Amino acid sequence: MQHTAPALPSLLRRLERPTGPVDVVLDTDTYNEVDDQFALSYLLASQEQLSLKALYAAPFFNENSTGPADGMEKSYAEILRLLDLAGSKFPSELVFRGSQNYLPNEETPVFSPAAEHLAKLAREYSPDHPLYVVAIGALTNVASALRKAGAEVHVVM
């Protein structure tokens, strides 16, 4: 799949500080390390500037999991646990399970509910109103969504 890069002025404009609230999704391996829990807490506490649209559980594999699928499931459960602890009214139906494996290569996406949702959601945005993607885990969900969505998406990562 061949993609063309946006013109330099367009790219530079995307780097400017937004003047109002921005729409954000968080792709996170929340169970893996504590920084992800802080990031989620910050997003929940910053809804005037950051309009949270979805949460995606990312895969991870280390001593805290038996494999990427187990890491993703633990992160999914941790997201729900943190939302409950925070007393958040963020709808649980906007929390999505991510990929159960890592990307096998640069061309092959790994589909998941998270990747499907992000691909669909990203198509609703424009260069003047981009979707901000905060990815602080493995990039499998985001890369798979971008592969699926194609060149018509407008996201800032």
Language-model features and meaning:
Residues Q2-E73, Y102-M157:
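Active-site histidine-anchored catalytic micro-motif
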